[in-house]
Regions:
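Conserved phosphoryl-transfer catalytic core
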Residues: 63, 72-87
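Short, leucine-enriched amphipathic alpha-helices that occur as contiguous helical runs
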Residues: 15, 19-27
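Short alpha-helical scaffolding segments that buttress acidic/His motifs in well-ordered protein cores
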Residues: 104-108, 122-129, 174, 178, ...
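Amphipathic alpha-helical segments used for helix-helix packing
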Residues: 99-103, 116-145, 186-187
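Hydrophobic alpha-helical connector segments
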Residues: 82-121, 171
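Helix-turn-helix
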Residues: 21, 29, 33-63, 67-71
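C-terminal peripheral helix-coil segments that are non-catalytic and often amphipathic
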Residues: 2-5, 142-269
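Short Lys/Arg-rich basic patches
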Residues: 10-12
Length: 269
């Protein structure tokens, strides 16, 4: 259940106009179950409204969702672009990948810190970037193409050795990893797990979070040494599977010597 958020306050007190209640109900249901699982019947029941109210204020479920995303994401993305522009002006020599990644985090973190709506907002971001609905994916691509392109170019300048296609793949996985964390956890629980019981400031907290994702962008990608390790593990897995199959059928083959690298307790190099 969503806790510590501002979405249910209107519903609990019965105050607020119908349009606001519909938006709040939509946000809550979207965070909890995603776009496809959310029906107008669910929205109106939670908002204490009727279908005629949705048609009057928005016209459709799609238009209602578009309004919610615009209200929540447009200010965030404006702040991200402003921060990126300011940093590029201060550092014309170039920015590192971790710094660019930080510019995606910091405005969102500010909105979640010291704000009763913050945990809900962070989970909304996680759901938006991980929801598989074609409608959500299409909306993000159509409405936020400029900011996506702006940050992609910033990452490309920070990582000039990466082919653009590979950079796109790495960014996709990095954002998916972040989305999974944000969509599935209470923000305070996530912070607690990162600070490991220590008293740390915001900069230290964000640095740790960014350090978890930065290797997705910067780690070597399928080097010959990495491929060799995986090939040896695959060979060992096939050998183990054959041994298990032989044991199940009552036919035990002769014992084969384990690879030297495995006896020594290390990965092959």
């Amino acid at each position: 259940m969503l806790r510590g958020n501002c979405l249910s306050k209107t519903q609990r007190t019965g105050h607020g106009d119908t349009r606001k209640r519909l938006l709040e109900a939509t946000e809550w249901l979207f965070i909890e179950g995603g776009y496809e699982a959310m029906s107008l019947r669910h929205i109106t029941a939670r908002a204490g409204a009727n279908l005629a109210a949705v048609n009057y204020h928005f016209g459709s479920k799609e238009a209602l969702m578009q309004e919610l995303l615009s209200q929540r994401l447009d200010p965030l993305n404006r702040d991200r672009l402003q921060l990126l522009s300011a940093c590029e002006q201060q550092h014309p020599e170039g920015l590192g990948a971790a710094a660019v990644l930080g510019m995606l985090f910091i405005p969102a973190f500010r909105l979640s810190h010291g704000n009763t709506c913050g945990p809900a907002f962070m989970r909304l971001l996680g759901r938006v970037y991980s929801d598989p609905s074609p409608f959500i994916r299409s909306y993000l691509q159509d409405h936020y193409r400029p900011i996506s392109g702006r940050f992609f170019e910033a990452f490309s300048r920070a990582l000039p050795a990466l082919p653009r296609q590979e950079l796109g793949l790495r960014l996709h996985f990095a954002l998916k990893a972040l989305s999974g964390m944000l969509a599935g956890e209470d923000m305070q629980e996530l912070i607690t797990s990162i600070n490991k019981g220590e008293t740390i400031n915001d900069a230290e907290l964000l640095a740790r979070l960014i350090s978890l994702l930065s290797p997705i962008l910067t780690a070597p990608f399928g080097t010959p040494a990495q491929v060799k390790v995986i090939e040896q593990l695959l060979d060992l897995d096939r050998s183990t599977a054959r041994t298990d199959l032989a044991a199940d059928t009552g036919h035990i083959p002769g014992e084969s010597a384990a690879p030297q690298w495995l006896k020594e307790g290390r990965l092959a190099s």
